[in-house]
Regions:
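An intracellular "coupling" helix at the cytosolic face of ABC transporter transmembrane type-1 domains
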Residues: 146-147, 163-172, 176, 221-242, ...
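ABC-type nucleotide-binding domain
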Residues: 2-5, 363-364, 370-617
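Transmembrane helices of ABC transporter permease
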Residues: 45, 49-62, 73, 107, ...
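Short intracellular "coupling" helices and adjacent cytoplasmic loop segments at the cytosolic face
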Residues: 22-27, 127, 135-159, 163-165, ...
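Juxtamembrane loop-to-helix connectors within ABC transporter transmembrane domains
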Residues: 35, 43, 122, 142-186, ...
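Helix-loop-helix
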Residues: 81, 192-206, 276-349, 354-355
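Alpha-helical segments in transporter systems
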Residues: 17-19, 37-40, 48-73, 104, ...
Length: 617
């Protein structure tokens, strides 16, 4: 059908991609500081909660850090007791050891309680932030202009609500506590190591740059492969999505082998990049283990020499070795959380970018009331293009009297559907004006203006729910009797009664449990129930069989009496009784009149009409 594509959402391209792999190179924000600033403004209302999280995380970490040194006293007491027992000068002081173990148990128990509290508070804050963002995005969608959705894919819009908000929430929930815990652990452990032995601390710290250098080398090498993996994961998802969505076309043209070959090529690249990235990423743990063991060996050797000289105790060596492990662990955690923060900020940037998009002006000062609209419509020298380089409607002028049935016909791309979009203010004209009852459409509030129009599109839209609920969508406060009356007027009552449950029959997600013709009848019943003074029928009967079309046509004829109606028709035989037929070509009206008048002119309309019957024969 002609420019009906303007009403359709662009084809899906798999932009949602899929979940980000572990260790994958993070997407970086274009404006890191600006995005962080906006995110902080959302978190700002939870200052007390954030402060409590930081305090609890720090306290829990401090108790954990103190534990090993106190446990070292147990090791020292055991070794000294063993030496006394061997020398025959005494035995184990289990009373002393028991007291220390109780103290350590209490410390770790308090640490767990504080960790639980900070986790509980942070999860609550994160979910509240995500809830608020999702709510704002949902409200924003209803205020966005049509051009935004027609220039983007399904996945690109949906990912703002799903993937991006989830990534933001996950990063927010983990990054703050991880950073606080890691920094507190590093500082606390460093202080405790210095209190045991500055020399051993120096040895442990010297090994640290080796660890950082090796990890940085591996990360740098693997990031390129992770980037390729991420890119081709998106390609894989896109191919699967498109193949599934168009599986009937693929099968009808016997293109299964071509699709499989194309998929295999993409999958081979994904396999190669994923193998290399995961292999290199998997090398990090062995490298850290090697460096860590090297550090343990150096510390143990130095500690043994110092213990022989009675500079430190055996318990101090045991505690110090544990501290060395605790000292390197936060470095890995911070490296991981930095990637997570980058992904979080990039996701928040996309969310805020969406929230900052230009909105439609929903209201005007001193708006014209839509009550009592008669339905007179004037197009005065309207010019419009979706972009500056291409003008679709060049100089469109017409006067439509109240109650007239106006058919708009023309070849593909003539601008028929665009006229309807301008009438409902999905777009605003570049030049000229559109008047309803003598008032410029820009003088109405958009919402109230659109309430004056009833619309039936070629692409039927029904949501998951009962048939009763779907018809009632046209008038939410309608009674069951009004819904049934609308269904009868649309000649839909009979087939509804034959369905399991009748009006309570549950439609599935894409309403595939009813036929295309039945879907069309339900959307017409919805428009009848809405009872708007002006009707727009965009190929309302093009998707149904001839018998169903006849039933619909009779119902629509009754509905259109006394109402201004615009019919965009491809089958010209359906608009013979229109009061006025506007014939469009290249954005202009080239002919207008009744069906008989236009045929008598033997012009462009006659050519269109005759060509359809030639094709049919």
């Amino acid at each position: 059908m002609e420019d009906n594509k303007d009403f359709k959402t662009p084809p899906r391209r798999g932009r949602m991609g899929g979940p980000r792999g572990m260790g994958m190179a993070p997407e970086k924000a274009k404006d890191f500081k600006g995005s962080i600033s906006k995110l902080m403004s959302y978190i700002g209302r939870y200052k007390i909660g954030i402060f409590a999280v930081m305090l609890f995380a720090a306290v829990a970490t401090v108790f954990n850090v103190i534990g090993p040194k106190i446990l070292g006293k147990v090791t020292t007491a055991l070794s000294e007791g063993l030496m006394r027992k061997i020398a025959g000068t005494g035995g184990m002081d289990f009373n002393y050891i028991g007291k220390i173990l109780i103290i350590v148990l209490c410390l770790y128990l308090v640490s767990v309680i504080f960790s639980f509290c900070q986790g509980w508070i942070m999860t609550g804050i994160t979910q509240k932030v995500c809830y608020r963002l999702r709510k704002e995005i949902s409200e924003k969608i209803n205020r966005m202009p049509m051009k935004y959705f027609e220039s983007r894919t399904y996945g690109e819009v949906l990912s703002r609500i799903t993937n991006d908000v989830d990534t933001l929430g996950m990063g927010l929930n983990q990054s703050i506590t991880t950073i606080i815990t890691s920094l507190t652990t590093m500082i606390g452990v460093l202080v405790m190591m210095l209190s045991i032995s500055p020399l051993m601390t120096l040895i442990a710290v010297i090994i640290l740059p080796i660890s950082v250098g090796l990890v940085s080398f591996v990360v740098k090498k693997s990031q390129g492969y992770f980037k390729t993996q991420q890119e081709y994961l998106g390609h894989i998802n896109g191919q699967i999505e498109e193949t599934y969505g168009g599986h009937m076309i693929v099968k009808s043209f016997n293109k299964e082998k071509d699709m499989v070959d194309s998929f295999n090529k993409t999958n081979d690249v994904l396999y190669g990049s994923a193998w290399k990235s995961q292999f290199l990423s998997g090398m990090m743990h062995p490298i850290m283990m090697f460096v860590g063991n090297l550090g343990y060996a150096c510390v143990a050797l130095t500690g043994g020499l110092l213990a022989i000289k009675n500079v430190i105790t055996i318990g101090d060596i045991q505690a110090f070795i544990q501290y060395v492990k605790n000292f390197t662990q936060p470095i890995q955690q911070i490296a991981q959380v930095i990637n997570q923060v980058q992904s979080m900020v990039a996701a928040s940037e996309r969310v805020f970018e969406f929230l900052d998009e230009e909105e439609e002006d929903q209201t005007v000062k001193n708006p014209v009331s839509t009550e009592g609209i008669k339905g007179e419509v004037d197009f005065e020298h309207v010019r419009f293009g979706y972009n500056e380089n291409q003008t679709i409607i060049k100089n469109f002028s017409v006067n439509v009297k109240p109650g007239q049935k106006v058919a708009i016909v023309g070849p593909t791309g003539a601008g028929k559907t665009t006229i309807v979009k301008l009438l409902m203010r999905f777009y605003d004209v570049n030049d000229g004006a559109i008047l309803v009852d003598g008032h410029n459409v820009k003088d109405f509030n958009r919402r109230e203006l659109r309430d004056a129009f009833g619309m039936v599109l070629q692409d039927t839209w029904l949501y998951k729910g009962t048939i009763m609920e779907n018809i009632r969508y046209g008038k939410l406060d309608a009674t069951d009797e009004e819904v049934i009356a609308a269904a009868k007027a649309a000649n839909a009552h009979h087939f509804i009664e034959t369905l399991p449950g009748g009006y309570d029959c549950e439609l599935n997600e894409d309403a595939s449990n009813v036929s295309q013709g039945q879907k069309q009848l339900l959307t017409i019943a919805r428009a009848i129930l809405a009872d708007n003074p002006i009707l727009i029928l965009d190929e309302a009967t093009s998707s149904v069989d001839t018998r169903t079309e006849e039933r619909i046509q009779k119902a629509m004829d009754n509905l259109m009496k006394g109402r201004t109606s615009f019919i965009i028709a491809h089958r010209l035989s359906t608009i013979k009784d229109a009061d006025v037929i506007l014939v469009m070509k290249d954005g202009d009206i080239v002919e207008q009149g009744t069906h008989d008048e236009l045929l008598a002119k033997n012009g462009f309309y006659a050519d269109l009409y005759n060509s359809q019957f030639e094709q049919a024969s």
